[in-house]
Amino acid sequence: MMLKFLVQQVGFNQAQRYVSTLTVLTCALACFIARPNPAHPFRKPETWARVGVWVDTHAFRNRSFAWLCAAISFLFFGFYAVFFNLEEWAAETGIGFKDDPRGGALDNPRLQPDAMRAFWLLSIMNATSTIGRLSSAYLCDHFGAMNVHCVVTLIASLLTLILWTLADTVKAAIAFVVLFGVFSGAVIGLPPASVAHILGPDPAAQAKLGQWTGMMYSCAAVFALTGPVIAGHLITEFKNDFRTVQLWSGACMFVSALCMAMSIYSKHRQMTHEWFSEKRRRLSSVTSANLSKSRSRGGVSQREEV
């Protein structure tokens, strides 16, 4: 919002300088006041030059993590296209209007009587995402990060596939951006928490949290880069039909939710296998101890008889 109004008042170059200065100051403040969690285990490698410090070659043997990487890749494939194309969709359908760089608003014969600035739709979506980011932390503590992440991603996909495609009035558009904004905040903020959920409570495993999170985002980076480009090409190819990007984004997020469900299933299967293995180990230990006691008692009895 700040950049939008500054460009109109002082020009693009000066507006970028003001916003960049504010960004530097806020990031510097975060660096000074942020403190690491003393309870979190940190790895201390002997040298940072080894590949194993940056890439855990055994990570993808964990099926739950592999499914999560696929889920985040599909998520980024379609998620950002919603934000990149929202204003263009609003202007094309007459729900909103875009400002003319020379002043005033661009002419649009489809403009609805109660149309609003298309920019405000994106601002509302970004603002309501704060609700999802904050509330998801509470929900994860009670229901598990992966479970919450899967549900909010599924809901976000359904909102895109159903509500966005049917929105043809300003009120419907506002309803979509508010609801999608709330769930998008949770969707985009929970991947690191999902990685922590997969690693489990073991301190040795939690020490790999940063490494595995970086690997996950590295896998998804290519999809985050190409997804909006593909969505834009679909709009152009089908003559400004924004149903293409709506279906593209919704389908990608739906597949992402399915991959998250598979990740949850793999995690539960792994935990069940570990639980049965531990039970068998304890049962074997108890059985061995009882056999040893029986043999000891038998030897004592034989000596007494002698």
Residue map of PLM features:
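Intracellular juxtamembrane helix-capping segments at the cytosolic ends
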Residues: 1, 186-205
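Interfacial helix-cap and linker-helix signal at transmembrane-aqueous boundaries
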Residues: 1-11, 90-91, 139-143, 228-240
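Helix-loop-helix hairpin linking two adjacent transmembrane segments in secondary transporters
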Residues: 1-38
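Multi-pass alpha-helical transporter architecture, strongest
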Residues: 29-35, 247-306
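Juxtamembrane intracellular "pre-TM" segments in multi-pass secondary transporters
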Residues: 41-69, 280-304
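Extracytoplasmic gate region of multi-pass secondary transporters
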Residues: 61-150, 227-231
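C-terminal transmembrane helical hairpin of 12-TM major facilitator-type secondary transporters
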Residues: 112, 117-119, 123-135, 140-194, ...
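A late C-terminal transmembrane helix in Major Facilitator Superfamily
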Residues: 199-240
